[in-house]
Amino acid sequence: MKGGVYRILTLHLPEKQLVAVYNGFNSHFHLQPKAPEITRKYIDADEYLFFLGNTDPKKNTPRVLKAYSGYLKKSAKKLPLLIADLKEDAIDRILEEEKMMDIKSYLSFPGYIENTDLAALYSGAFAFLYPSLRESFGIPMLEAMACGTPIIAGNTSAMPEIAGDGALLVDPFSPEDITAKILKLENDGTFYQQQVEYGLKRSQMFSWRNTAESLLSIYKELSLSNICPVSK
């Protein structure tokens, strides 16, 4: 995020005059008890992997499905995958092209998910998959972390900046890397809990209060500077 914006704006402004103010996210997303009465509307499982996919190439859906196929070959648990915002025909095209129809029985694809149900779905997920090719910010990462769910995010564009150094980042062009990170979470309980705790702490940095306070601080600094003198 910051790097891309800075590269554009420094063509016209000195870098010292640029300050990044991060978005917040809805406080509706927070650590909460499991809600099977909600999650069962979308997937018939107590535990699952969660992916917000669509037909936009940047969401990296084909590689996520390849990674999931690799996961099924190596996992003892074989957790099902909940895919939001993607219709069955779109999934079928990918599975047929990649010769992966054998994994379809492990997939749940309810299509559109109500925003009011998202927090429960994040909370019920074993992990949230977000290995996009690029994102300008990545609010779903923060929503999932705030719900106590470990994330697996791409190591490109704004995602490392927002997710932070302690997050589980992957090469989004490598299904094998995505597979390995899912298995790392599944096979290492201590590491899994560390990711839960890291995400809860990291997500607290992105409240709308912090956004407002950052903006207020900038406005105060500008009002005391000579950057925009007031004419009398």
Model-derived regions: residue spans:
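Carbohydrate transferase catalytic cores enriched for Leloir-type hexosyltransferases
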Residues: 1-232
